[in-house]
Swiss-Prot record:
InterPro entries: AlgH-like (IPR003774)
Protein name as it appears in the record: UPF0301 protein Csal_0058
SUPFAM superfamilies in the cross-refs: VC0467-like
Superkingdom of the organism of origin: Bacteria
Family the UniProt entry places it in: Belongs to the UPF0301 (AlgH) family.
NCBIfam families, A to Z: PRK00228.1-1
């Protein structure tokens, strides 16, 4: 099995599940036990400032208080997942996804962000997307998703609403021109 860790999942136009319709998901882990990732193109109305306030963290030093928190997926919707650049991981609970991309789930990173000492580039998500062993592979066979290798510049330099089309551009396609009907060969 080829791992899809550090890949994007692009929802095909015919995917009508409201949790994933029109989404770009960044896969953080994929092995024989299952798959885990976060949706990176669904900003919520909740801002980082409001989230930090809910957690009783003073965000006075946080330079990106107005940054939106993202809907990361339908699993563990009450947990924070922070996707960020970096290979030096001083945080309590981090997973190195690629050379320069990691996922952290520990409160110490949110405290550092609130104090203006967090990573320069990051996306805060509430919830994640997860698939049981073999489930994503079945969905791929059903043409539910397209996959392409992940790209840090799309994650951290492209506006959230443009990330899906930017990832599709790597493949040379425009999802708006694709049929809503799934094809199988």
């Amino acid at each position: 099995m080829q791992s899809l860790k550090h890949h994007f999942l692009l929802a095909m136009p015919h995917l009508d599940d409201p949790n994933f319709k029109g989404t770009l998901t960044y896969l953080c882990d994929h092995d024989e036990n299952g798959t885990m990732g976060v949706i990176v193109n669904r900003p919520m109305e909740l801002t980082l400032d409001a989230l930090l306030e809910q957690l009783e963290l003073d965000a006075a030093e946080c330079p990106c208080r107005e940054m939106p928190v993202h809907y990361g997926g339908p699993v563990h919707k009450d947990r924070g997942f922070i996707l960020h650049r970096g290979s030096s991981l001083p945080w309590d609970s981090s997973l190195q996804v690629a050379d320069d991309i990691a996922l952290t789930t520990s409160m110490d990173m949110l405290k550092a962000i609130a104090n203006g000492q967090g990573p320069e580039d990051f996306i805060v998500c509430l919830g994640c997307a997860a698939w049981q062993a073999g489930q994503l592979e079945d969905e791929l066979k059903q043409n539910t998703w397209l996959t392409v290798e992940g790209d840090a510049s799309i994650l951290f330099e492209v506006h959230a609403e443009q990330r899906l089309s930017a990832a599709a551009g790597i493949l040379g396609i425009d999802l708006n021109l694709m049929s809503r009907e799934a094809g199988h060969s």
